[in-house]
């Protein structure tokens, strides 16, 4: 791989692996609210929020950092109060008590109306229209959580990238994908051969996500899956092993994040849980194996870049649980740390695809830590089987002899084949009494 290609991939990783405070879907809605509010001279007395079904699904039941509350209204209200879109996915970071009280008053005022946007829209679509008397402001985010394609104040356009967005492919594409289209060969080559000093920035993801795990273990967040694994019953029946330690690391960070703990994690491809799942199992196993600095860095890069590659094909949001993708990345990192060859790492990918493809996404919520645990367990099993040169073959289900084609099969199911499932899941979620 030439130096130019390496630099383009480094730029891609730095674009896709970024800090985020809170679940990225409600945070993205808060960002849109902050953008619109930043244009207003007065506090709005009416706020209309129109969302794609996938955004609504992922924002309904998740905790909002530092509030003790769940769901969209408080996230939107905080965005209005903060009114600082330059903070991007950290727009809810460092909320002051007086800001929270002001946001709660906005929620209590019932000025926020949330609905599904009708028509042919991207799976990641957020539109906010707010007004106060004769003053108004609007914002649209599309395709990427921070991609503000439109903003206007009193009908005067401030930002307009809608035509550019319309010209892009309607497939699961993004700016980063247009820069460089990855493959299994490229991901492996980059992770193995790029100078370590140029990719060791990935250790910041390990540091941030480990911190989230440590915060969680000191508290009682969500379903406390991580604490359960390390508790008396967990140790009695699950034991103490590399697997249980990586499960603890990963699930506890997810516990905290989904319950709204005020922690910043390093996301991957727009998802904090994907960043956690791509990072912490690999970090935990590297520590257990006493892997040196270089091997740890390369394993983390291999895992995270594999997630980016699969998400290029799948899209930012889908009916497929993101932990399937992220755990596939971590399985690659685990296999590498076990001494696996390129062929065996490919086996690990096929084993993952042959196992947990089809795990559906029913929104971001505390129980995501249980799905993450399932993904991490499968990642370990898939890597171990690969080391034994055991692999799901092309005679079995959707797996193909070619690794890239197997990934294509996985992503086409999540992107195209599960759309009816996605609709049914949202209908069930929104019709519960």
From Swiss-Prot:
Q: Where are the transmembrane segments?
A: none
Question: What is the superkingdom listed in this entry's lineage?
Answer: Bacteria
> Record's InterPro entries?
Ser_deHydtase-like_asu, UPF0597
Q: Name one GO molecular function term.
A: L-cysteine desulfhydrase activity
Any one GO BP annotation for this protein:
L-cysteine catabolic process to pyruvate
> What family does this belong to?
Belongs to the UPF0597 family.
Protein name, per record:
UPF0597 protein PG_0909
Annotated source species: Porphyromonas gingivalis (strain ATCC BAA-308 / W83)
């Amino acid at each position: 791989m030439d130096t130019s290609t390496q630099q383009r991939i480094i730029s891609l990783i730095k674009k896709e692996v970024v800090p985020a405070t809170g679940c990225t879907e409600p945070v993205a809605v808060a960002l849109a609210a902050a953008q619109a509010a930043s244009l207003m001279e007065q506090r709005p007395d009416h706020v209309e929020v129109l969302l794609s079904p996938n955004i609504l699904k992922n924002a309904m039941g998740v905790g909002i950092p530092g509030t003790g509350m769940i769901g969209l209204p408080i996230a939107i209200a905080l965005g209005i109060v903060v009114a600082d879109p330059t903070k991007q996915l950290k727009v809810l970071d460092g909320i002051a008590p007086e800001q929270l009280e002001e946001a709660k008053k906005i929620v209590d005022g019932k000025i926020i109306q949330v609905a599904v946007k009708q028509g042919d829209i991207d799976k990641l679509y957020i539109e906010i229209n707010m007004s106060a008397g004769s003053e108004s402001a609007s914002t649209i985010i599309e395709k990427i959580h921070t991609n503000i394609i439109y903003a206007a104040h009193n009908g005067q356009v401030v930002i307009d990238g809608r035509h550019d967005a319309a010209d892009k492919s309607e497939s699961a594409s993004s700016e980063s994908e247009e820069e460089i289209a990855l493959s299994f060969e490229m991901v492996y080559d980059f992770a193995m051969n790029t100078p370590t000093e140029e990719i060791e920035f990935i250790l910041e993801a390990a540091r941030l996500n480990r911190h989230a795990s440590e915060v969680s273990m000191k508290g009682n967040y969500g379903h406390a899956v991580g604490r359960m694994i390390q508790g008396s019953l967990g140790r009695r029946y699950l034991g103490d092993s590399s697997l249980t330690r990586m499960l603890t690391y990963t699930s506890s960070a997810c516990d905290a994040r989904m319950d709204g703990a005020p922690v910043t994690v390093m996301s991957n491809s727009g998802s904090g849980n994907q960043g956690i799942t791509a990072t912490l199992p690999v970090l935990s196993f590297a520590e257990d194996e006493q892997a040196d600095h270089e091997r740890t860095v390369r394993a983390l890069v291999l895992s995270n870049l594999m997630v980016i590659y699969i998400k290029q094909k799948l899209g930012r949001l889908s009916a497929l649980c993101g932990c399937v993708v992220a755990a596939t990345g971590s399985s690659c990192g685990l296999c590498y740390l076990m001494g696996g060859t390129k062929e065996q790492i490919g086996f690990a990918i096929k084993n993952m695809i042959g196992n947990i493809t089809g795990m559906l996404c029913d929104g971001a919520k505390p129980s995501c830590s249980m799905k993450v645990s399932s993904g991490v367990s499968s990642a370990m099993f898939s890597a171990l089987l690969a080391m034994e040169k055991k692999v799901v073959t092309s005679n079995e289900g959707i797996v193909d002899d070619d690794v890239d084609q197997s990934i294509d099969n996985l992503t086409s199911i999540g992107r195209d084949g599960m759309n009816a499932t996605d609709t049914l899941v949202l209908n069930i979620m929104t019709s519960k009494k």
